[in-house]
Amino acid sequence: MSAQTDGPYGPLIPMPELTPDALRAAVTRIAPSRVPALTQHLFEATTNAQQTQSLAPLRAFVHSWAVFVAIERHPERAARLRELERLVDAGEQDPAAAIAEIRGIRETAEAETGL
């Protein structure tokens, strides 16, 4: 895992390496309830990679879970994302601003992962 700090309220954990094992370890620490979903996704990605003889499903798995970890390791960022998703799902307001902020959160997370 690479070292990274954001001051006194920095990330819960450093950003892990972009490998299935490192991502699983990170998810176990920051969102243990999501480990079954990660395991299922990895199984499906591995099966699809074998069937299609392509690494694309495994790359998609790593991308998806790396972004998840990059968001969830920052509790304030994760809470804000969930709040924005609730606003969009509720459909009570124009979702444009919330969608733009969600996009920004995801782009920041992708940049942190190097993807």
Roles of regions detected by a PLM:
Residues M1-D6, A111-L115:
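Structured catalytic/translocation cores of nucleotide/phosphate-coupled proteins
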Residues A26, H41, A45, F61, ...:
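Charge-rich, solvent-exposed alpha-helical interaction surfaces
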Residues R34-H74:
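Amphipathic alpha-helical interaction modules
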Residues A78-L115:
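Amphipathic alpha-helical binding modules
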